Amino acid sequence: MATLDNAAIVRELYAAWNKKDMDRVASLATADARVTSVPSGMKMGFREDAEAWATAFPDGEIQAVNVVAQGDYVIAECVGRGTHNGTLKSPAGDIPATGRRVELPFVDCHRLRNGKITESRIYFDTGSMMAQLGLSAGPTATQRPTAPSPEHRH
């Protein structure tokens, strides 16, 4: 698939998500495509991930600021905006709606094969998102700091 075509597919992904057309979103990816949230390590199916964000931010919108394609890879610098009016899935457990507005820059790294997205990795500042939601940006239960080992104590 040509590089320009891959960039167009990713732009179409964001347009479909903005319309909350999850059938179209899913049609742009392979059936086994996975999304990895790099900050948390969470992995979901492609449609499941898109639906999770749409549930958490029903008025959400993605603005693709820069989309760069090279071979099978498309990197998209984006800004996501929306109101947290639904449950947000997180590795520490579900976060109930806060009613707070969020504006979050993020970067998506997509891999495509034969005109379909096969995997995506999303990079974003979880601390900024948690602060905008009015929640602690501290470590989650799975990331609790540990005491230094005896040889590292002063």
Predicted regions and their residues:
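C-terminal and inter-domain tail/linker signature
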Residues: M1-H154
